From Swiss-Prot:
This is Degenerin del-1. InterPro entries: Deg-1 (IPR004726), ENaC (IPR001873), ENaC_CS (IPR020903). Glycans are attached at residues 241, 300, 394, 508, 562. It comes from Caenorhabditis elegans. Belongs to the amiloride-sensitive sodium channel (TC 1.A.6) family. NCBIfam families: deg-1. Residues 89-607 are extracellular. The keyword Transport applies. Its main location: membrane.
Length: 664
């Protein structure tokens, strides 16, 4: 009995352990399903609970035909949503922008004002420069011919190389051919500007380049070519067989013991550069006249506007080749040009408030308010509170190439380089010219919304050092670099990028041809693309309105120094009155902004997702949690599984020990 009782007790103990172990396996947190089963359960739970309404309806319905219907509807909505997404993305990729206009009611800072005389150099001083004198003489010859040219001659004229032209040594005196009126019984003759029938009937005169006089004159037959022992700096030579050790070609009138330096090319004809008529048709001098005109660069030109334009370009090039101090001495001084000045109702200090700016086209210009550190502003709108100037241009000393009398004005920012030839306004004499200005501050967007240069990214290749970036300065810099690369020298009209660069010789015809050719190439749209000159991101733009009235009036009391008898008429001919002022005490700020930002993109995409899928940002977060959970199940390490099994075994052992203890 006892033995039987012990067997029954052992059997009960074993059954109790199995029941406890089974209960532990059912309730233990360490029990783990297969990863595949866990993923299936995770997907099922997500689909049944998700806020993506189409997915939810597919997995919660029990009818197959309803489930199929929801699948079709969901696919159609997904396609429509993706199509809508593509349109929204295209709109964002276009990087469209809008311009916001803000009107600021306060006094705007006054701009810098650069004023110039339309005539760049004084005529009497410019003619003392041999290069300019030659250019003006050639211009005179071209204008005279244009008044008397015939189409038959023009069609038969071909352009010759400028290398065949004259090459003079620049001295004050030179021999010239002239038609003469000789007094019987005297050797000397009187020079005339008309053309003789032949050179044999002409005289040779000693021509003074400085004052344009031709004296003395002797018959050409009494002059002979010779070799002189010495010539001085102004062109006179010692007669042969006298003091000196040189062998210099010269022209001599031996009867008078008179010799002058012989030019390297042909002797000039006075009727070509001072005469008012060309040689008669059929004369041998007429053909020579036209050949000379072609060599000077005016071949096949009869339009005086075109002739004047070309003469201006030649003169600008030759003047630009002079030393800046010498060039400035040929122009107008500050006190000569600006006679009276007031700003904001107060008298200006002309000596200190105007800064010299030498422009290649207009010579000496003067800039008011050029100091960036000094801020000037008008206290009120209107002419009385702006800049008022009386300028004296002295039109009696104008160059023959200057077509109008008056002044040139450029309105620009204080940190910008003035370009009066490109962005200037002309004001005539005898008129009070009023320029009403308005400021517009422009703020552009950089990449990817626009293409502009930011302020903190200056152009290192700009030749205008110390000035703010401008597209015009960029184009001129690009042109200068191209000229240096192609012609081997720098255009004298613009600054040099490097000190080691040499200026182009304006008297060298090969160099001039290179400047003309390369300048024409750069003017094409295709070549301008290589310059990559873009607008600045921040820019002050001044708009101008112009009005004028006759000046001075008959009742005004004016002083004209030595011309007090008819002062008003004198001022109308030689002076101009200028007014530059703000039209209103406000200015505009134009600011570009994003038309369609990243926030707009997200909002529109969310709206489309909600419309077609019933989804929101919460749905996206929900899906991300599901994806992370599923990925974690699929990528669970094997070591973690082994550790879980070990923990489960330990728990079973602990449970067995617990049962044993309870039985005891």
């Amino acid at each position: 009995m006892a033995r039987k009782y012990i067997d029954i007790l052992k059997k009960s103990k074993m059954m109790l352990f199995q029941d406890v172990g089974k209960s532990f396996e059912d309730d233990s947190p360490c029990k783990e399903e297969a990863p595949k089963t866990q993923i299936q359960h995770s997907v099922r739970d997500f689909c049944e609970q998700t806020t993506f309404h189409g997915v939810n309806m597919i997995f919660t319905t029990s009818l197959y035909w309803v489930r199929f219907l929801w699948v079709v509807v969901s696919l159609v909505c997904i396609c429509l949503c993706m199509y809508s997404f593509s349109h929204v993305k295209d709109k964002y990729d276009r990087k469209e922008k809008i311009v916001n206009v803000e009107l600021v009611f306060e006094s705007a800072p006054f701009p810098a004002i650069t004023v110039c005389n339309l005539n760049p150099f004084k005529n009497h001083l410019a003619r003392s420069v041999p290069e300019i004198s030659e250019t003006l003489d050639a211009f005179h010859q071209a204008v005279v011919y244009s008044n008397d040219a015939t189409m038959d001659e023009l069609s038969g004229r071909g352009r010759r190389s400028l290398n065949d032209g004259p090459s003079f040594k620049y001295l004050q005196y030179e021999p010239v051919y002239s038609d003469c009126s000789c007094v019987p019984g005297r050797q000397e003759c009187i020079a005339q500007t008309s053309a003789p029938r032949t050179l044999e009937n002409a005289c040779i005169c000693n021509y003074d380049r400085h004052d344009g006089s031709a004296w003395p004159c002797y018959s050409a037959q009494t002059w002979e070519k010779s070799i002189c022992p010495e010539c001085n700096d102004i062109g006179f030579c010692n007669v042969p067989n006298t003091t000196g050790s040189g062998n210099i070609p010269c022209y001599c009138q031996l009867e008078m013991g008179y010799c002058v330096f012989q030019p390297e090319s042909r002797v000039r004809r006075i009727w070509e550069f001072q005469g008012n008529k060309i040689p008669e048709k059929g004369s041998p001098l007429r053909k020579e006249y036209m050949e000379q005109l072609t060599q000077l660069g005016y071949g096949n030109m009869t339009d005086q506007v075109a002739i004047t334009t070309q003469a201006k370009e030649k003169m600008i090039l030759k003047m630009s080749g002079l030393h800046p101090q010498r060039r400035a001495a040929l122009g107008y001084g500050k006190s000569e040009l600006i006679k009276m000045c007031s700003f904001n109702g107060q008298q200006c200090n002309i000596d200190t408030e105007f800064k010299l700016h030498i422009d290649p086209s207009f010579g000496n210009c003067y800039t008011f308010n050029a100091n960036p550190e000094k801020k000037l502003a008008s206290s009120r709108a209107g002419p009385s509170y702006g800049l008022r100037l009386m300028m004296f241009v002295n039109s009696s000393d104008y160059l023959p190439t200057t077509e109008a009398t008056g002044v040139r004005i450029a309105i620009h920012g204080k940190e910008e380089c003035p370009f009066p030839d490109t962005f200037g306004y002309s004001a005539p004499t005898g008129v009070i010219s009023s320029f009403g200005i308005s400021l517009r501050n422009i703020n552009r967007l950089p990449q990817p919304y626009g293409n502009c240069l930011q302020k903190d990214n200056p152009q290192s290749r700009s030749i205008y050092k110390g000035y703010k970036y401008e597209p015009e300065g960029c184009f001129r810099s690009c042109y200068q670099y191209r000229i240096i690369a192609k012609c081997g020298c720098a255009d004298p009209r613009y600054p040099k990028p490097w000190k080691r660069s040499a200026w182009c010789d304006s008297t060298n015809t090969t160099t001039l041809n290179c400047l003309t050719t390369e300048g024409a190439k750069l003017s094409t749209k295709e070549n301008q693309k290589h310059c990559k000159c873009i607008q600045p991101c921040q820019q002050d733009q001044y708009t101008t309105t112009y009005s004028a009235a006759k000046w001075p009036s008959g009742s005004i009391q004016t002083s004209c120094d030595n011309h007090s008898k008819d002062c008003n008429s004198y001022l109308r001919e030689h002076a101009a009155m200028i007014e530059i002022y703000y039209e209103q005490m406000s200015y505009e700020i134009l600011r570009e902004s994003e038309s369609y930002s990243w926030f707009n993109l997200m909002a529109d995409m969310g709206g489309q997702a909600g419309l077609f899928l019933g989804a929101s940002i919460m749905s996206v977060i929900e899906f991300l949690f599901f994806a992370v959970r599923t990925l974690g199940i699929a990528c669970k390490p094997r070591r973690w599984r082994q550790k879980t099994e070990l923990l489960r075994a330990e728990e079973l052992n602990d449970a067995e020990k617990g049962v044993s203890t309870n039985n005891n």
